[in-house]
Amino acid sequence: MTTESLETLVEKLSNLTVLELSQLKKLLEEKWDVTASAPVVAVAAGGGGEAPVAAEPTEFAVTLEDVPADKKIGVLKVVREVTGLALKEAKEMTEGLPKTVKEKTSKSDAEDTVKKLQDAGAKASFKGL
């Protein structure tokens, strides 16, 4: 076949409708005794049959959930300590709960922060991001 005849063939194929292309595919499969389906890839079975474990998050957020009225001053001091906020901002953080005290922090820092808040009388928790 010459380059010219190949270009003509490509042009004709480009003008076929989806239905015509489907029929052409079937005819070629029959003529050449092949299938145009994607090959199936076999996946090796795992040894234990256990589900894959999700990767543990590396960043955490600490949430201040509740502060009893009689513990507010102690919690306020801890919030200032762990966030570095001024008194006014720390006070606002302890009102209208729940509020995120820290974001994108390590697990050990999140655990320490929650422990300090709980020791001061607040209800706090952390979760992975």
UniProtKB/Swiss-Prot annotation:
Molecular function, one GO term: mRNA binding
Region (Disordered): 94-113
SUPFAM superfamilies recorded: ClpS-like, Ribosomal protein L7/12, oligomerisation (N-terminal) domain
Domain of life of the organism encoding this protein: Bacteria
Cellular component annotations (GO), alphabetically ordered: cytosolic large ribosomal subunit
Keywords annotated in UniProt: Ribonucleoprotein, Ribosomal protein
GO biological process: translation
Pfam families: Ribosomal_L12, Ribosomal_L12_N
PANTHER family, A to Z: 39S RIBOSOMAL PROTEIN L12 (PTHR45987), LARGE RIBOSOMAL SUBUNIT PROTEIN BL12M (PTHR45987:SF4)
Subunit structure of this chain's protein: Homodimer. Part of the ribosomal stalk of the 50S ribosomal subunit. Forms a multimeric L10(L12)X complex, where L10 forms an elongated spine to which 2 to 4 L12 dimers bind in a sequential fashion. Binds GTP-bound translation factors.
HAMAP family: Ribosomal_bL12 (MF_00368)
Record function comment: Forms part of the ribosomal stalk which helps the ribosome interact with GTP-bound translation factors. Is thus essential for accurate translation.
Family per record: Belongs to the bacterial ribosomal protein bL12 family.
Protein name, entry field: Large ribosomal subunit protein bL12
UniProt source species: Chlamydia pneumoniae
Chain's gene name: rplL
